[in-house]
Amino acid sequence: MAKHVKVAVTGAAGQIGYALLFRLASGQAFGLDTTVDLHLLEIEPALPALKGVVMELEDCAFPLLRNMVVTSDPRVAFNDVNWALLVGAAPRKAGMERKDLLEKNGSIFAGQGKAINENAASDVRIFVVGNPCNTNCLIAMNNAPDIPKDRFYAMTRLDQNRAIGQLALKAGVDVPSVKNMIIWGNHSSTQYPDFYHATIDGKPATEVIRDKNWLLNDFIPVIQQRGAAVIKARGASSAASAANAALDSVWSLINTTPADDNYSVALCAQGQYGVDEGLIFSFPCRTENGVVSVIEEIEHNEFGQQKLKETLDELREERDAVEALGLI
């Protein structure tokens, strides 16, 4: 039987939105057996640009794209949707402190959480791309009390994909050879790209890449700082790679994970690995028959434990900051 999905995308006229929508409409997230409605949300000044994007979507004549809704009203955008991809966020500007960014985005994501809570379909799932995505997700989740907490996710797949790419380059192998590359914690420069548990052609990555100095002192900082490096080189933040990672994430959350692999996504912690219950923290996950679960039996060496502590401390600080602002 043919399947149908209604998907809301916020910040739909932005760079990531532009890189995302055409691939969503062509079936790359939900499969070639699923038709799609797109509910596109933008701020009022961006609606003319969004109408141009809609014209282009129409001009692609995608067989799977059924209907499009264009709006600046979150209640309309989230009406009856099965997936809400929260891409739009206020960018960090020069001289802005992280807490200023948390406050500005906090009000956006609190409002969107409420609108999703009141208007979305009963099976809605929420995937946050807009940064700081872990804490934006936390805010949306806490403003949508009727939606189960296990339906909220934030994106660390871009970090995972970046890490896979770098390990493949260093080892001189094709990308599919690299598996089980885990990102722990926050999508920020404190994240822990865990090469210790990655595999290359079925062997531990540390056996294939013997250069421990590179792994510790080049690989980890490169992944942690990759977003900033892209901005410096391109003059704009990662857009196509972020959209690609969002599609990868949705696919992984829906489809059964291959037996020899896992994927990273930030979700609501339930005490795994000593992470506070209710924090949005990136873990290694698997999907089996549509059920997403955290892999819990991974052991960390002293280095890994320290890295987990650093990223957990940052997420606690962000939570405390938005709590003090009354956003959760």
From Swiss-Prot:
GO terms for molecular function: L-malate dehydrogenase (NAD+) activity. Its EC number is 1.1.1.37. The active site is at 187 (proton acceptor). NAD(+) binds at residues 11-17, 105, 112, 129-131. It catalyses: (S)-malate + NAD(+) = oxaloacetate + NADH + H(+). The keyword Protein biosynthesis does not apply. InterPro entries: L-lactate/malate_DH (IPR001557), Lactate/malate_DH_C (IPR022383), Lactate/malate_DH_N (IPR001236), Lactate_DH/Glyco_Ohase_4_C (IPR015955), Malate_DH_AS (IPR001252), Malate_DH_type2 (IPR010945), NAD(P)-bd_dom_sf (IPR036291). Substrate binds at residues 92, 98, 131, 162. The keyword Transferase does not apply. GO terms for biological process: malate metabolic process; tricarboxylic acid cycle. Keywords: NAD, Oxidoreductase, Tricarboxylic acid cycle. Disulfide bonds: none annotated. Catalyzes the reversible oxidation of malate to oxaloacetate. Belongs to the LDH/MDH superfamily. MDH type 2 family. This is Malate dehydrogenase.
